[in-house]
Amino acid sequence: MRSRKLTGAVRSSARLKARSCSAARLASAQEVAGSTSAKTACLTSSSHKATDTRTSKKFKCDKGHLVKSELQKLVPKNDSASLPKVTPETPCENEFAEGSALLPGSEAGVSVQQGAASLPLGGCRVVSDSRLAKTRDGLSVPKHSAGSGAEESNSSSTVQKQNEPGLQTEDVQKPPLQMDNSVFLDDDSNQPMPVSRFFGNVELMQDLPPASSSCPSMSRREFRKMHFRAKDDDDDDDDDAEM
């Protein structure tokens, strides 16, 4: 009987231990599930906040673009054309400089410069149109320059025509080259070369008298005798000077 009681007590204690272990496992599993649910809730809330902020920023940007487009539609085209535009200043200045050069007188140039200072940068086309209209009315000087160029061309043509007869007379006065059939031109001939072609008239040279020698011709012996005599005379003079 005692052995049965002992075995029953051991079994009951083992059952209690198994129940307590299962309860502890269930509690730990519930705790893990609660922590994961809290984490997922935090993540979902943060993602919702991020999406809300992004959508709000996009909504604000869209609102700004819509407001700008509405303002541009409300502003008339004339007002938009009158607004100052950022354009390079160099073409305008070049056009005003050309206009002042075309207009006669200093007053026209001063008026054009004043107009350039008063008008905005976008009014370059108006000034260029007015300048073209003034040139059509006859205030510019390109026509005169074209006329002067035509006059200069006419004068140069007349001068050339006047010079042409003089050139023709000079050509007529020059005698043409005459090729004679002389012996000098014949390469195969054995006759002597004509001297008159190089030295002029040879007959005048033959009439001249022969060149006279300055000193008479003497032999070598006579020259030696004279040399020694002169040498002896020099020695005698030296002796007399020493005495």
From Swiss-Prot:
Residues 233-243 have a biased composition (Acidic residues). GO terms for cellular component: nucleoplasm. Residues 145-157 have a biased composition (Low complexity). The modification Phosphoserine is found at S148, S189. InterPro entries: UPF0688. The keyword Phosphoprotein applies. Residues 78-100, 132-243 are annotated as: Disordered. Keywords: Nucleus, Phosphoprotein. It is found in: Nucleus. Belongs to the UPF0688 family. This is UPF0688 protein C1orf174. The gene is C1orf174.
